[in-house]
Design a protein with these regions (language model features):
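A short, N-terminal "cap"/entry segment at the start of jelly-roll beta-barrel domains
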Residues: 1-51, 131-137
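Conserved short histidine dyad/triad with adjacent acidic residue
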Residues: 36-70, 89, 99-103
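Preference for bulky hydrophobic residues occupying beta-strand positions
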Residues: 57, 77, 116-117
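Residue-level marker of beta-strand positions
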Residues: 64, 94-95, 113
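Short acidic-glycine-tyrosine-enriched beta hairpin
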Residues: 84-108
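Ligand-binding loop in jelly-roll beta-barrel domains
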Residues: 100-127
């Protein structure tokens, strides 16, 4: 069975976005993994603005994100491996979200690749900074 041709709903409208409103396409597989301040954790920042961050994380087996508090909603989708904390385990294809004020330490016992969405930078127990705009400067 061959795919149906795409139906154009508004063929009479040709949207033209100015450069500041244009879509941004990223070649994620060819982006380099960047080291973080935490051993065994690398990051690809896909979007960041005023604390809002979308990023891929690669965690080596046994890597730990130290104790921290989410200052706003945090969402994580696990692509590979598992992410564990004192509240549960999130495996491949699973999703976890944490409300503002949630505190935890996360570990990837066998390694993991995660897609994370943050509305504001986290507050770490010992003052560490992690994937914040200040680090990028």
């Amino acid at each position: 069975m061959s795919p149906q041709p795409r139906k154009v709903v508004h063929a009479d409208i040709k949207p033209e976005n100015p450069p500041d409103l244009a879509s941004r396409y990223l070649d994620v597989p060819n982006m380099p993994w960047e080291k973080t301040k935490f051993p065994g954790i690398e990051i690809k920042v896909l979007y960041s603005d005023s604390g809002i961050t979308t990023a891929l994380f690669r965690m080596a087996p046994g890597a730990v994100v130290p104790l921290h508090e989410h200052t706003a909603l945090e969402q994580t989708y696990v692509l590979e491996g598992t992410l564990e904390d004192h509240e549960g385990v999130c495996g491949p294809g699973q999703f976890v979200w944490r409300p503002a004020g949630n505190q935890h330490e996360a570990v990837a016992p066998n390694g993991a690749v995660l897609l994370g969405f943050f509305l504001k930078p986290n507050r770490f127990a010992y003052g560490e900074k992690f994937f914040t705009e200040e680090e990028a400067k």
